[in-house]
Amino acid sequence: APERINHWVTAFCFVLAAVSGLGFFFPSFNWLMQIMGTPQLARILHPFVGVIMFASFIIMFFRYWHHNLINRDDIFWAKNIRKIVVNEEVGDTGRYNFGQKCVFWAAIIFLVLLLVSGVIIWRPYFAPAFSIPVIRFALMLHSFSAV
C-alpha cells in the first residue's frame, strides 16, 4: 500500500503541476489554471505542488534505483529493438527493460532540473536573490525540462 500511495501522490502532483504549467506557458490554455481555483491561486500553489512531487519522487527513487541500473542485458535488449518492435521474444530483461530504465533516469534528471530552475524563478521567495539573466535561463530550463 505505501508504494501505491507514493505513486499516486506523485502522479496527482504531476497532473496538477503540468496543467497549471501549461496554463502559465500558453495563454490559450489559461483556463486550465481553474483546476487550482483561480490563476492567482495556481501561481501560489504550483511551486509547492512541484516540491511535494519532487519529494515523493525521491522516495520512489530510493526504492527503485537499484532495479534501474543499466547492465549487459540492457545493451542486448537495446541492440535488438527491431525484434521488440515486431513483438518477437528477445529474452528476460529483469524487472525493468532498457527503455523503462532510460525513462526512470530521464525523470530523475529532469525533476532535479525542474526543482533547481523552479527555486530560482520562485517569486517572491527566491527569485530576488538571482540576476535577471539567471532567471531568464532558469525559465528556459524549466520550460524545456517540463516537456
PLM region spans:
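Membrane-embedded alpha-helical bundles that constitute the cytochrome b-like, heme-associated redox core
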Residues: 1-147
